[in-house]
């Protein structure tokens, strides 16, 4: 319940700060970051977090600073805001943030004094060793006729709030301090006696789980947070020029003040947007939206270039799809014209010329003692017209030269 009240108060304070303020000096910004405990090495926020019932409730209950709270609710916008702080301030937003090279944010929703005040108060109440005064007699259970002077001593004990109701602040390490006091016993039989007593001194603390005994006997019905941020029950109002109705804050807001909430006409199912779009992420060094995964123009390979809007590698010559010529088609994978011609078996395809060519030719057939047949792309041998029936001993008839030749000249007849 306290968390809901805090969120309502935070939203009211943020809405009250919609009037853009002056630019703060870099020194002031640096001091603010230091107060919030920001570091240059920011952990990766990952994808836009889904606002689903129990998961959201657990995250909200476990946050321990303004930085963590904003990172849970508005991960990308908050990262962009801190990036702008490190760059020396913020700028007025561009209404079309995804198309510009540099995403500019408005300062209206981020009143530094309010956030700093909340975070300072938050840090003061964290679970940690705190200097307290303890009653010596009660600490050790002294007899009623014995007391100490001074009656109290100063030691450190764990105290503060845990960020979840199921936890309590407990000490994880303890040291002991020796204190010298006067011990007085009545009736007085002797004067005050100096005594040295050791007191437990907590040196480190941690929020730890409570025992579940009571919860097993008495179930506590708690009202859960809604699965999504509450929508306004009232109908959308007609807002003046340059103002847009906001379903979450239930009022008209200036367009330039939209920083936590996206344009109503472009709401997604969960009501939140990635500030850089689905294919981009924030580069915290340059405060610009860049393609995810470190995709650069050099990553696309030959014949391709990087489309900075879609963050995809596209063909450089895609505008010339119809210039491939006959029997060629444009291949989207290689970004080149490839031959798609079908050739007969005896005329294999020449990919370079995209033509069906014969494997045999006149010269090849001549070397085989044959003639070239253009229609069939094959070599053939014309029959001998003067074939001799008998050759002299040691000679054999050659079908290639149509005469008798020495037998050892004759090659095996391949055909």
Swiss-Prot record:
Highly expressed in the lung, ovary, preputial gland and the adrenal gland. Expressed in the post-pubertal mammary glands. One of its GO terms (cellular component) is membrane. Residues 1-31 form the signal peptide. It comes from the Eukaryota. Disulfide bonds join 127-169, 158-205, 162-207. PROSITE patterns: PDGF_1, PDGF_2. The keyword Kinase does not apply. InterPro entries: CXCXC_repeat, Cystine-knot_cytokine, PD_growth_factor_CS, PDGF/VEGF_dom, PDGF/VEGF_growth_factor. Keywords: Angiogenesis, Cleavage on pair of basic residues, Developmental protein, Differentiation, Disulfide bond, Glycoprotein, Growth factor, Mitogen, Repeat, Secreted, Signal. Residues 276-358 are annotated as: 4 X 16 AA repeats of C-X(10)-C-X-C-X(1,3)-C. Undergoes a complex proteolytic maturation which generates a variety of processed secreted forms with increased activity toward VEGFR-3, but only the fully processed form could activate VEGFR-2. VEGF-C first form an antiparallel homodimer linked by disulfide bonds. Before secretion, a cleavage occurs between Arg-223 and Ser-224 producing a heterotetramer. The next extracellular step of the processing removes the N-terminal propeptide. Finally the mature VEGF-C is composed mostly of two VEGF homology domains (VHDs) bound by non-covalent interactions. The keyword Plastid does not apply. SUPFAM superfamilies: Cystine-knot cytokines. Residues 32-107, 224-415 form a propeptide. Sequence repeats lie at residues 276-291, 300-315, 324-339, 343-358. One of its GO terms (biological process) is positive regulation of protein secretion. GO terms for molecular function: chemoattractant activity; growth factor activity; vascular endothelial growth factor receptor 3 binding. Glycans are attached at residues 171, 201, 236. Changing residue 152 to S: Inhibits ability to activate VEGFR-2. It is found in: Secreted. Indolinones; MAE87, MAE106 and MAZ51 inhibit VEGF-C induced activation of VEGFR-3. Growth factor active in angiogenesis, and endothelial cell growth, stimulating their proliferation and migration and also has effects on the permeability of blood vessels. May function in angiogenesis of the venous and lymphatic vascular systems during embryogenesis, and also in the maintenance of differentiated lymphatic endothelium in adults. Binds and activates KDR/VEGFR2 and FLT4/VEGFR3 receptors. Homodimer; non-covalent and antiparallel. Interacts with FLT4/VEGFR3; the interaction is required for FLT4/VEGFR3 homodimarization and activation. Belongs to the PDGF/VEGF growth factor family. This is Vascular endothelial growth factor C. The gene is Vegfc.
